[in-house]
Amino acid sequence: MTQISAKDVPGMGRRQFMNLLTFGSVTGVALGALYPVVNYFIPPKASGAGGGTTAKDELGNDVTASGWLADHKEGDRSLVQGLKGDPTYLIVDGPDSIGDYGINAICTHLGCVVPWNAGANKFMCPCHGSQYDATGKVVRGPAPLSLALAHVNVENDNVFVSQWSETDFRTDEKPWWA
């Protein structure tokens, strides 16, 4: 066998360069498209001692108890981003306290977001008329079940939302969402 000198070895041709460029571009796009899919299946990191998720406001900022209480009056129910990114109502119990539970705002009938009607003191679904009392218990269908609950904990002024797995205090039954 004869040795080929370095100057006789042909350089990368245009076709090979274009193949490498195409492969790199397709690989980059595929990885970019797969990232959100893979991220969906990875559970969020636990925060706080209770293992909850940090509550976030409508802009995606962490909710602080002091800021929330300064902007919301007693009896107010306002939305935050809770577990799994679901809209969750934080309840202001008093001038200086956030309730120890939150109410998931997803209607149990068809999944619409249920707004709080302060005048009627209940949640009223705009899609098909289901109604829930101030604690999220269904009072008028077609929704078959009460709204899901979540624990709310305040630690070092940060608000955390965690899974509710105990008995539902509204129905004295096991929670359907756990």
Curated annotation (Swiss-Prot):
Family (UniProt): Belongs to the Rieske iron-sulfur protein family.
Pfam families: Rieske (PF00355), TM_PetC (PF25471)
The protein's Enzyme Commission number: 7.1.1.6
Alphabetical list of InterPro entries matching this protein: Cyt_b6_f_Rieske, Rieske_2Fe-2S, Rieske_2Fe-2S_sf, Rieske_Fe-S_prot, Rieske_Fe-S_prot_C
Stated name of the protein: Cytochrome b6-f complex iron-sulfur subunit
Source taxonomy: Bacteria, Bacillati, Cyanobacteriota, Cyanophyceae, Synechococcales
Chief location: membrane
GO biological process terms, semicolon-separated: photosynthesis
Catalytic activity: 2 oxidized [plastocyanin] + a plastoquinol + 2 H(+)(in) = 2 reduced [plastocyanin] + a plastoquinone + 4 H(+)(out)
